[in-house]
Amino acid sequence: MKAPVLFSILLISFLSICRGENQAKHLFILSGQSNMQGHRPDEAFTPTVGKAFGKDNVIVLQDALGGQPIHRWWKKWRDPQGKKPEESGDLYDRLLSKVKLAIDGQKIASISFVWMQGERDAKMKWGVLYEKALVGLHTQLAEDLNWKVSDLAFVIGRLSDFDLKNKKYPHWSMVREAQVRVAKSTPKFAWVNTDDLNDGKNRKGREIKNDLHYSAEGYQILGQRFAEACIQQI
């Protein structure tokens, strides 16, 4: 093979590699409480967004903790008496530190924030505060990532049909409604239905019906729905 031809092939290969390394990534941030903690991105979410954009072009980061109210993420949250809780924004700081580490040195094409939470706030009767908190959390994340608020996609997992009569969690319906209102407030927001995900066998093999948490299959479907909703926003 002549030297000029060989050089051209090597140059094209090198440029292709460089383009791959410099390709802007699609960032997906997943957070919330137990039903997000039970979700495993590798089962459905990551493969789905990877298929849509290329597995090397996506960054998926999940950080969640069960049983936690939204004020562990949104720092401006105040209780009905106007008091700041002792634990305020600490889980958000943990999440943000992981996000910044994951995107260090990367070019970002889009950011999608996926949120599955609200059970604790419904139980604590903080439903009246939830809509403001959701919007505030989204804005807080956009600002901390230096991203335009209107360009940050927001996908919300609506609370399931676990306690529609509000017996165990007095503000269950209130939080559900707040989630939908926020999701419908701007084109970059969306909500995902979970009403059919809490029947069947859980991850321990126990049969569940209309449970607080989802079945093993339900978590896989949840990941698929989250991914599809994100893809539609990008």
Model-derived features with residue positions:
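Sec-dependent N-terminal signal peptides
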Residues: 4-14
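Cell-envelope and extracellular/periplasmic
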Residues: 20-234
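Mature, extracytoplasmic segments of signal peptide-bearing proteins
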Residues: 16-18
